[in-house]
A protein has these predicted regions:
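A short loop-to-beta-strand scaffold at the N-terminal edge of the catalytic core in hydrolase folds
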Residues: 10-19
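Conserved HGGG/HGGXW glycine-rich cap/lid loop of the alpha/beta-hydrolase fold
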Residues: 20-71
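Active-site loop/oxyanion-hole signature of alpha/beta-hydrolase fold enzymes
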Residues: 57, 63-102
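Gly/Ala-rich beta-loop-alpha elbow adjacent to hydrolase catalytic centers
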Residues: 103-107, 111
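Alpha/beta-hydrolase
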Residues: 157-169
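Flexible "cap/lid" loop of the alpha/beta hydrolase fold
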Residues: 116, 125-157
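Residue in the alpha/beta-hydrolase core beta-strand immediately N-terminal to the catalytic nucleophile
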Residues: 100, 123-126
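Active-site signature of alpha/beta-hydrolase-fold catalytic machinery across serine-
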Residues: 43, 113-117
Length: 169
């Protein structure tokens, strides 16, 4: 896979990995988890290419604040993942034809939002470990958020503790 740069309509630069693009092949777009980047999933992408006999185009974007992307990131001011959804929407719209959207953790939620916002563009959705809450947990989170109580999520704390360097890479 080759590293490329996507420039948004506002001039922000996003780094992404892309396989050898074949016109007319299916498009698979992957969104990584918080604290990760596209490189993390290269083994998965290679297995997908083999499964589809190399007849699939794979795109994996480094989301803002991650990997080699230079787009402005303000993690302290982040209130939702909407900015990542907006970035993803513009990215998939730049790809010719329908896309299969996929992601891991936060990335799977972004993929799901894109599928719901763009049903004519997103043909399939594949989610790995989506961050989903049941109705009661969701209500508790919204109340705590509204009251500004315990704003730190355990899942975010766990993501913040992830290693940034892996000796084998």
């Amino acid at each position: 896979m080759e590293r490329k740069i996507y420039i948004t309509k506002t001039g922000e630069e996003f780094s992404y990995l892309a396989s050898d693009i074949k016109k007319g092949s299916r498009n698979f777009v992957f969104f990584h988890a918080t604290g990760f980047n596209a490189e993390t999933y290269k083994i998965l992408f290679n297995k997908i290419k083999i499964h589809f006999d190399n007849e699939i185009n794979i795109y994996a974007i480094d989301q803002r604040g991650h990997g080699m992307t230079n787009a402005k990131s303000e993690p302290d001011n982040l209130k939702s993942w909407d900015i990542f959804v907006d970035d993803g929407k513009e990215f998939i719209e730049s790809i010719e034809g329908e896309v299969i959207c996929s992601g891991h953790s936060m990335g799977s939620i972004i993929a799901a939002k894109l599928a719901s916002l763009n049903p004519s563009k997103v043909s399939h959705l594949f989610m790995i470990e989506p961050v989903l809450y049941g109705p009661l947990e969701s209500l508790k989170f919204r109340i705590k958020s509204f009251l500004r109580i315990n704003r730190e999520l355990m899942i975010a704390e766990g993501a913040a503790k992830r290693r940034s360097h892996f000796p084998s890479i």
